[in-house]
Regions:
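Conserved phosphate/anionic-ligand binding catalytic regions in large, soluble enzymes, centered on
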Residues: 70-83, 285, 345
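N- or domain-start disorder-to-order transition segments that initiate the globular core
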Residues: 7, 18-65
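Active-site-facing alpha/beta catalytic cores
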Residues: 2-5, 16-20, 88, 94, ...
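Conserved, mostly hydrophobic/aromatic
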Residues: 74, 281, 349
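Glycine-rich phosphate/diphosphate-binding loops that line cofactor/substrate pockets in enzymes
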Residues: 59-68, 270-275
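Asparagine/serine/threonine-enriched low-complexity, disordered tracts
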Residues: 378-382, 387, 392, 397
Length: 400
């Protein structure tokens, strides 16, 4: 007898023939067409306006035309749509006071795994290994429609090349993770999406991998993909100019300090001399040494850099939830989970998040003042724009 998946010897002709194709595939289940799901779960005009405005603002910040910061903040991953809406309501209520920040809620439904584990709401929405992907896609799309209709733009990690067909029209900013930044498939995907994309440095700490990904994705590509009707097709893209680096640290240590930011900016400038060297810093992952309690420490360093006028810093990522920490799914399943606590990476709680964003908003104002004073002292503005106030070519936030 042969163990499962082991090829039988050629002399066992009938058994051998069965192992020529799909030898390790258990079966196929139909997947809903993207066009059908979009028809059934429709975004409102208000949601579409929120999405488009956030895309435009994020692109301007990345290009250096708006002096605010893009802030990607929210749970490490979404495992409860109800809790995600509760978090979004907190975020929406507080957003107006952070006029120096473009707040985009982290709404990740797919999780890359270093080893094995829960792969996210789309893959396993019931958290029980039943892999009801059609249900997961519907839940994810409905949640993004609800969040954006509330006035909260959303961010998504692009983990595969198919799920964006179901969700990309609702997204204002996307990320390519450390494990996939070097992947040609993901670079091709990023070249065709309609929103800004950040590339994380590699798991080994290499920033050049992210810089190369930016350069690749900003150019046109042709590749095999899937249409909204679910048909295989040749996809031809124009290239995405709204791309940037995300510093997330690595197994070798953090890379959020000023010298790391400037080194990354120099690498971007060398590769794309005509573009603003936009750098986003991830307060979690390698930069926090995988301890969510270190995220405020990382943010303090970012604030110090902003306060002295650093213009390459254009964004921040924070893993935040209603309550702090993380938890594993207990044997009894979702019913045994603590409310508002991540089931993947640890997150800071809402109260800590507010303190962090208050500090960050103040640091943006300090940077704005530093730059304005420098420009006025030197008698020119070089056409630098910030959000809202215009002074001889310099637009700053608030007064016109």
């Amino acid at each position: 007898m042969n163990s499962a998946g082991t090829t039988p010897p050629p002399e066992e002709a009938e058994a051998f023939a069965r192992y020529i194709s799909d030898r390790r595939v258990q079966g196929y289940d139909p997947l809903v067409q993207p066009a059908l799901l979009k028809h059934e779960v429709v975004s409102t005009k208000n949601a579409q306006d929120v999405i488009a405005r956030a895309r435009y603002a994020a692109a301007r910040i990345i290009a250096g035309h708006d002096d605010r910061l893009v802030v990607i903040v929210g749970p490490c991953s979404i495992h409860s749509t109800e809790q995600a809406i509760t978090y979004a309501k907190l975020l929406k209520e507080a957003m107006p006071k952070w006029d120096g920040l473009l707040i985009i809620m982290r709404s990740y439904f797919e999780k890359p795994r270093t080893n094995v584990g829960w792969k996210g709401l789309i893959n396993d929405p019931d958290l029980d290994g039943t892999f009801k992907i059609n249900k997961g896609l519907r839940m994810a799309r409905q949640l993004l429609c609800d969040l954006t209709d509330m006035g909260v733009p959303v961010a998504l990690e692009l983990l595969d090349t198919i799920s964006p067909q179901y969700l990309a029209d609702l997204v204002s900013w996307g990320a390519i993770g450390a494990r996939t930044t070097e992947s040609q498939l993901h670079r091709e995907l990023a070249s065709g999406v309609s929103f800004p994309v950040g590339f994380k440095n590699g798991t080994d700490g290499s920033v050049q991998i992210a810089v190369d990904a930016m350069r690749s994705s900003s150019n046109p590509h042709a590749f095999m993909g899937v249409t909204e009707q679910g048909l295989a097709a040749i996809v031809k893209t124009r290239g995405n100019p709204d791309v940037h680096v995300i510093l997330r640290g690595s197994s070798k240590g953090p890379n959020y300090a000023a010298e790391h930011v400037q080194s990354a900016a120099a690498a971007v400038k060398k590769s794309r001399p005509k573009s603003h060297p936009a750098i986003m810093v991830d307060c979690s992952h390698g930069n926090s040494s995988k301890d969510y309690r270190n995220q405020p420490k990382v943010l303090d360093s970012i604030c110090e850099q902003l306060a002295v006028g650093d213009t390459t810093l254009t964004g921040v990522m924070i893993e935040s939830h209603i309550n702090a920490g993380r938890q594993d799914v207990p044997p009894e399943g979702p019913s045994g989970l603590k409310y508002g606590v991540s089931i993947t990476d640890g997150c800071v709680d809402w109260e800590t998040t507010v303190v962090m964003l208050d500090k960050l908003n103040e640091a943006v104002k300090q940077r704005r003042q530093q730059i304005l004073e420098h420009k006025l002292t030197n008698g020119h503005t070089n056409g630098v724009h910030t959000n809202g106030v215009h002074t001889n070519g310099v637009t700053t936030n608030g007064v016109h």
